[in-house]
Amino acid sequence: MLKKRACLLCLMALLSLVSCKPKYGVNSAPVMTTAAADQVILIDFDQISDDVIENMNPEDFPFVKSLSLSGSNDTHMVEVQAEIVENVSPEALTIFLDQLMREISNAGAVQDFRYSKSTDESYGSFFQKIGVHYVITRGEETVEDVTVQPGETFPFTV
């Protein structure tokens, strides 16, 4: 009798271990994190600055002496300061600004997944809610001082 009980106990323990294995099937719908469209997600502009400066390859833009970014969730603006060297063509500056805005938009989309990333045709949706003020200087001379409000188009095209 004791042998039967021990055998039955071992069998039940074995069955309970076998039934507790993980499932390796495909879920019918992926689990997605969602947030309400009106929920405020604060943007970390210091992180955007770090990401953008890291991604802007100095070899691609050797004419840029310095680049700094900051921003404010209160004003919904990104502030960009860039200093360039002498004799930079307008075309080169346009390419730089285009790439810079794409990098800013993509960095913002990483922080708030409701923003779409930039494509070849657009800068994504980050600049629909966030504006940008950029100042390009050459020494003491201001080359460009432009404010683009949220939703407005940029004054340069590639």
Predicted segments — roles?
Residues 1-7:
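Bacterial N-terminal signal peptides that target proteins for export
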Residues 7-13:
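Sec-dependent N-terminal signal peptides
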Residues 11, 60, 71, 123-127:
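Sterically constrained small-residue positions within well-ordered secondary structures
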Residues 16-19:
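C-terminal motif of bacterial Sec signal peptides marking the signal peptidase cleavage site
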Residues 24-70:
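N-proximal, solvent-exposed amphipathic alpha-helical segments enriched in charged/polar residues
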Residues 65, 76-78, 128-132:
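Envelope-exposed proteins and targeting segments
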Residues 71-123:
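Mature extracytoplasmic domains of secretory-pathway proteins
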Residues 113-158:
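Polar/charged, Gly/Pro-rich intrinsically disordered segments
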